[in-house]
Amino acid sequence: MFSQNMIIRDGEYTKTIYTMIKEERFQDAINTLNTIPESSTTRAGLSLLGHCYYQTQDFIEAANCYEHLLNLVPDVQEYRLYYAQSLFQAGLFEEAQKIIATGLDSPELKEKVLQLQSAIAYGNEDYTAAQSLLLQRQDGNGQEASTKNDEGCLLYQANMYEDALQRYVSALQAGGFNPHVAYNAALCHYRRKENSQALNYIAEIVERGIRNHPELGVGAQAETEGGARSVGNPPALAASGLAQAFNLKAAIEYQEGNADGAREALTDLPPRSEPELDPVTLHNMALTDPTGGGAGLRRLAFLLELGPPACPPETFANLLLLCCKHEMYDTAADILAEHTHLTYKYLSPYLYDLLDALITAQSTPEEAEQKLGTLASSIGGRLRALAAKVQECRSATDQNALRMALREYEGALESYLPVAMARAWIPWRMDDFQGAEREFRASAEFCSETPSWRLHAAHVLFMRGDRYKEAAAFYEPIVRQNYDDILSIPASVLANLCVAYIMTSQNEEAEELMRKVERAEERKGNATGQCLHLCIVNLVIGTLYCAKNNYEFGLSRIAHALDGGSGARLCADTWIHVKRCVLGLLTGMAKQTIVLPSIALQETLNFLRACEAYGLTIPSVLTGPLEDSGEQPPTIGLEARKLRALLLRLMEYK
């Protein structure tokens, strides 16, 4: 690494600087040039600085250098082109267009100028102008691959993914492998839901990137658990297409519901510090952040403030969806109100109507139900028409038409499912589980084979309190499907299934399932962190017995689940079960409707004393992703002490 204290002998500056540029040590070259006063006033110095700044992606500084060069030598057309290119890369499209319009008319540069002009029009989303400029370009002089790629980009923006893919394949055939063109082809496959083909292109990009650029340290973050040294943003990273490839892989994993796989794909990226990350990587890290929504929301809000072209177009919608996911509906409403100009640009009518209904549900549930009902009817009608179309294509044995019809049907179903869930969620949040079940029955026509629909339908039946057998019938296929990897099943599913077995007198099945979970946790050990599956199962079962007024057994089960209150399992998530059950016991004792043996009361006191000791610094409540009141949250230790004091008072009451 170059040091500013490096001594360069007189007469060797030129050799040293050009060696640095040859070795792609552009920042070192910039540092050296900046020690020479003449660099900022001479043609040679400014030319070298402009090139180096451009290669380090400091496009504003590069533009400044080329602007000075134009003042020194206004007749050199190449500098005007480089100036415009730097402005374009900096996102200053209007300024770049002005530079082109003021004298950039060299016949030798015509093709490059047309290419830049079409790129500016494309960046401004003026696709008609971009198409017109593209038609003026010639395919000769090795430009065929570039032209085919640009044609593909325009077709992609028109949602003509199959035609765009053909152009990208032609570009690869005409110009040989190019990671950026290969990425574009992978993106088309992704949009067509052909993930295996997309992953094939991604694998080739990654393989070539690792082979050709070992200095980028692909996978180093995973090997060093995030402690790898940043490689920055060298030209090799931009040329390799690795950032785009890994981000697309993360998107595929995320879309398939594999959040861990998405995070792993992002971890495999060449190591960079957060300020060095490109907007797309920052956006995807926000969506896959495992620590909660706070950091993700802040990252997305930061990107939104950057605005285009730096801000990915999906940012606005994902920020609103993330707010709704964390039940921050007021925040979502504020964002919509503050960015009305983005609403029509980045939100489809469907997504806007869905978000509007979710936000409206907070104040007027009836109006939200009406909006969602209208949306569901519209999509439902389209689904029926598409289902008929699929049947027609099957009868006609037209495989291409069948594939297209199935793709359309799946896309419509993806739109329908969130609406159906939202309609059931409105009565669910008001504890109207019968109403929620009614909504699930209404959507069963289209969604009954969808895993997420079946899971949530099971939850609704379970909460009915008298439909445990039906709930178990929905839970069992989920468990059987992942029986060999039982810890991959949500703990709530296992707990609810055990309770359903107990409530339908299938105690042996419940015990067998719990033994299976216990053995899996023992095998897993502490290698990959704390396992709470068996703990949560026992907590839910204990809560069930407490709800049935069997506090002696219920509280003993809860204490066992939390290792007597002295283990690492004591946290806000688990403490809430303890609080509810102990408060239920205290209420019953105060009303003199519950009597517990002295030994059971003493065990409860010992359990609360252990929680008090081990929970002194553990927050007792879960906070929202952006909650920061400045006040210290209550702790488990403090609440356990209060509960113990109340229990002692009631025990002394005669």
Swiss-Prot record:
It is found in: Cell projection, Cilium. TPR repeats lie at residues 10-43, 44-76, 145-178, 180-212, 393-426, 452-485, 535-568. SUPFAM superfamilies: TPR-like. Transmembrane segments: none annotated. The keyword tRNA-binding does not apply. One of its GO terms (molecular function) is intraciliary transport particle B binding. Its main location: other. InterPro entries: TPR-like_helical_dom_sf, TPR_rpt, TT30. Keywords: Cell projection, Cilium, Cilium biogenesis/degradation, Repeat, TPR repeat. GO terms for biological process: intraciliary transport; protein polyglutamylation. GO terms for cellular component: axonemal microtubule; cilium; intraciliary transport particle B. It holds the Pfam family TPR_16. Required for polyglutamylation of axonemal tubulin in sensory cilia. Plays a role in anterograde intraflagellar transport (IFT), the process by which cilia precursors are transported from the base of the cilium to the site of their incorporation at the tip. Belongs to the TTC30/dfy-1/fleer family. This is Tetratricopeptide repeat protein 30 homolog. It comes from Anopheles gambiae (African malaria mosquito).
